[in-house]
């Protein structure tokens, strides 16, 4: 939410403050037609992080009677990124903490090949990003249906 607030004020998002990441972010926004969200439709959920664990549960919210847990990452991929887990539906929305690269379309794969040339890594802290992915996989195992930020869904085992 903090990054969206910065954008509303005409300031760069956290990732764009990095000389290494700013060009890639700007190109991504141009190619995707990105528009800032209307903040009247957003609200913070839970509390901020208090531990140094790769993933930390920071709150919950309910949609149609289903409780979703909010797990915030430690900033490996990008600061403030979160996963949303619904245990009773076995649904996981990990954002970019965990992506299905094998399920990328050809266009996504070609675009992602630009990253090494435009910046050294898509992560702000690659060792922490790896720890976040490992924590996510340990948490959901093969039970959850995973709908990540990129790539095709991964359907869990029943």
Residue ranges of model-derived segments:
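Metallo-beta-lactamase
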Residues: 2-157
